[in-house]
């Protein structure tokens, strides 16, 4: 299925039903009084995050979503039925924006998370509400209120722990195939990957992490060149980026260092926060470098690239070095989660009563 990561839709909640201005008319009841019921509430439009859905393609074609109107009230104290709500199921990771103001309405990050996108209109009042000691036969009633309608922009940002970053044909798809259950298209030409691929990497019975492979970047991606700029947003939720570099390009005129610097430059131009994310260097295709030249090739790259962070040497094709990379990632993610758990368990110092005790003698 084609990956669709953005869509625009219109949601229209149902109008409330009108109240009734009916009078009770029965044999032997000459002054029956008002018996007009209220109108029913209009149906609302809801969104719910569903982990079994991984695309917004349904909303690319179905752009208008309407809930039912509430029914009108009737005589004999009959209230109108409420309009049925409708629920729009969206992938986990969908950000919902107001298309007119670009205000972020919600971020669906948890499976089952539920949100009202458009509230149904309230039903109108029947004339039974207007009866008083001075007005025994009221003819007043109110109409139902209109339901909300909104133009929305849906944007899907995949939820992954690790993001793969690199030039086209750097071997990212081969790497995600080697370490995970993902099976993207692989070929020996650039731009094989046309949409993000997610893979689950299992490192133990109860341990795993998710890797995202996005289309390769080229210079000028931040301004819209190539395909990768459309998907850079998917890296914003990751915890660590793997910068995959082809250390043995077929075209000998291509300088891997210059390409790596171009990628870093695109990151910086696109989003400073993304640029500051933890980033590891993964030097790929070492199987294409003669064994006696590998050490010198790696040292030369690291020196010219002026890289100070973690470096992993791998061959995604032969799986050489991939297991060490996987275990290093899992260890890093475990440490991050342990730190987050410790921070969440720490008491809030603002609520510690001992911090608010004041020694009045010292103040004197």
Curated annotation (Swiss-Prot):
Annotated region (Disordered), positions in chain:
128-147, 340-364
Q: Please list the residue ranges that the record marks as compositionally biased, kind Basic and acidic residues.
A: 349-364
- Any Pfam family: MMR_HSR1
Record keyword Magnesium present: yes
Q: Which PROSITE patterns match?
A: G_OBG, GTP1_OBG, OBG
Gene Ontology CC terms: cytoplasm
**Which residue numbers delimit the OBG-type G domain?**
160-334
Q: Which residue ranges does the record assign to the Obg domain?
A: 1-159
Q: Where in the cell is it found?
A: Cytoplasm
Q: What are this entry's molecular-function GO terms?
A: GTP binding; GTPase activity; magnesium ion binding
Name any cofactors this protein relies on.
Answer: Mg(2+)
Query: Entry's InterPro entries?
Result: G_OBG, GTP-bd, GTP-bd_Obg/CgtA, GTP1-OBG_CS, GTP1_OBG_dom, GTP1_OBG_dom_sf, OBG_GTPase, P-loop_NTPase
EC number(s) on file:
3.6.5.-
Identify the PANTHER family for this entry.
DEVELOPMENTALLY REGULATED GTP-BINDING PROTEIN-RELATED (PTHR11702), MITOCHONDRIAL RIBOSOME-ASSOCIATED GTPASE 2 (PTHR11702:SF31)
Subunit text: Monomer.
Q: What is this protein called?
A: GTPase Obg
> Per the UniProt entry, what species is this protein from, by scientific name?
Ralstonia pickettii (strain 12J)
Q: Which gene name does the record give?
A: obg
């Amino acid at each position: 299925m084609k990956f669709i990561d953005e869509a625009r839709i219109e949601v229209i909640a149902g109008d409330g039903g009108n109240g009734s201005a009916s009078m009770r008319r029965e044999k032997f009841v000459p002054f029956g009084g008002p018996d007009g019921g209220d109108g029913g509430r209009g149906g609302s439009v809801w969104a719910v995050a569903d982990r079994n859905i991984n695309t917004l393609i349904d909303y690319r074609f179905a752009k208008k979503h309407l809930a039912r109107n509430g029914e009108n009230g009737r005589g004999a104290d009959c209230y109108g039925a409420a309009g049925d709500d409708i629920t729009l199921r969206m992938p986990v990771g969908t950000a919902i924006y107001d298309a007119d103001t670009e205000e972020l309405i919600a971020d669906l990050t948890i499976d089952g998370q539920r949100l009202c996108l458009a509230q149904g209109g309230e039903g109108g009042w029947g004339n039974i509400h207007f009866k008083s000691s001075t007005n025994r036969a009221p003819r007043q009633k109110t109409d139902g209120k209109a339901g909300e309608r909104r133009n929305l922009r849906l944007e899907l940002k995949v939820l992954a722990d690790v993001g793969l970053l690199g030039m086209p044909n750097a071997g990212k798809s081969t790497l995600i195939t080697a370490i995970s259950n993902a099976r993207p298209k692989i070929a020996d030409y650039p731009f094989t990957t046309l949409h993000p691929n997610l893979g689950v990497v299992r490192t133990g019975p109860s341990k795993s992490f998710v890797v995202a492979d996005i289309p390769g970047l080229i210079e000028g991606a931040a301004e819209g060149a190539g395909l990768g700029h459309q998907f850079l947003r998917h890296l914003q939720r990751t915890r660590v980026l793997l910068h995959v570099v082809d250390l043995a390009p077929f075209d000998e005129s291509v300088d891997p260092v210059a390409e790596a610097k171009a990628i870093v430059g695109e990151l910086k131009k696109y989003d400073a926060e993304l640029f500051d994310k933890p980033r590891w260097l993964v030097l790929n295709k070492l199987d294409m470098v003669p064994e006696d030249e590998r050490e010198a090739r790696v040292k030369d790259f690291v020196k010219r690239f002026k890289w100070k962070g973690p470096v992993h040497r791998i061959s995604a094709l032969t799986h050489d070095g991939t297991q060490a990379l996987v275990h290093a990632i899992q260890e890093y993610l475990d440490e991050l989660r342990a730190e987050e758990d410790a921070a969440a368990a720490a008491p809030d110092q603002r609520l510690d009563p001992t911090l608010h005790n004041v020694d009045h003698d010292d103040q004197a």
